[in-house]
Amino acid sequence: MQNFVLQLLADLAKYDLDGIILDRCRYDDYGLESDFSDISKQKFEEYIGETVANFPADIMAPGTDELPSEQPAYFKKWLEFRVKVIHDFIVKARDKVKSVNNNIKFGVYVGAWYSTYYTSGVNWASPKYNTSTYYPKWATADYKNYGYADHLDYIFLGAYASVNNIYGSGEWTMEGFCKNGRELLQGDVPFAGGPDIGNSTGWTDGGQSAKIPDAIDACINNSDGFFAFDLCHIKMYDYWNAFKTGFDKYLESIEE
């Protein structure tokens, strides 16, 4: 499957594009329950240099979908292995794109909720960010080695907070997501944070034009750009004027 996707990227890179961005480059959204295949078991055992006698129980009990209070012997090492798998694919994908056209920018989309993004098998932070210092319950000392920010030309962070949690300093506020993102990325890559204006709490039925300028303000002033998920929602709920208002306010602020 990896080779198939890499060939798709090579074919795509032959076109005159400004950039290529990967989405859903992660483990399935069943999170911790995804991919206990024979090949994953084999690759994991090769990685740790040991045989896992009780698989998957020595990693996690079947049905585990959140951080267990009592962790089996290989639980944290399994999380490390998963982020290595995604890290290594990102490196291959970038190399494949650049081998065809070195001028194409290469990036990814990720959810900004880093504190629980280990369930998706992704460490999008800089390898300079020592994850285990801040999240010792689930990150090994080597987890940081598989941060892939330094392999990207840009990254989109989904700051997908609810309509009433735009400003703030922690996760699950748009502003907080972007502020945390800057710390996590350590300057390795420019990033754009932005809201989900069609699916997050309070956004699903439209009618939130008044909130759009604040969402733009919170994200664009705490990151290196702005993006919104998704264009179809802007059109569906006729948010065009609201977006123009938000961007005009930003442009006025940087001209002062």
Language-model features, listed with the residues they occupy:
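Polysaccharide-binding and catalytic clefts of secreted carbohydrate-active enzymes
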Residues: 1-151, 158-160
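Substrate-binding cleft of secreted/luminal carbohydrate-active enzymes
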Residues: 138-256
